[in-house]
Amino acid sequence: FKKFNLGKAIQAGKDAAQAISLSDADIAAMSKEYMEWMDKHNPLTKPDSEYGKRLERLTGNIKEVDGMKVNFGVYEVVDVNAFACGDGSVRICAGLMDVMTDEEVMAVIGHEIGHVIHTDSKDAMKNAYFRSAVKNAAGAASSQVAKLTDSELGAMAEALAGAQYSQKQEYEADAYGVEFCVKNNIDPYGMYKSLNKLLELSNGAPASSYMQRMFSSHPDTAKRVARAKELADKYKQ
């Protein structure tokens, strides 16, 4: 993908979405590079580990979601976290699997995939690329396709870790999580239960944590949890 002219972008005062003209192919290439970097810098559990076996039991039959090929993995880290990327990669941290039931884990997976399907992750990737370029003073004008450097990928990982979605985006991802559970014969209340659990864990959690990012707008938190329950109720009627 092409490097953007950072000087002009800053001078124009444009936000990330406006400053960067990235095609779907660019995003796909960045996503692939990003996931290669993440998998290199985080310990992936082995398929025959307890986490690996559990993940296979939950997701082994899921090869594609809404036309997107998916692959799953577990990072053997204590963080209560999960994310999905534009290349179809879904990663769950062992810390999240430790505190959640199977249906709650599946709901979170569905929620994160929902952000990709709804292109929320694409926008977050654009913003992260802009922020990483600023941090690394990258962005010299170039018409040549270039790979991200290791430092740029590290900065992008840092930027994505702090990314927050709008309440509307979170509502839609929650709804997708409920539907994902239903399609895979999982309790539709998994989303409601996982949100409740994350809400409990968010008390006192660092502002940069997954729990705090999931509930970035505190006044609407109760509504969001209630809405997830209402969505599940419809499938139980």
Locate predicted features.
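A Zn2+-metalloprotease active-site environment signal
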Residues: 1-237
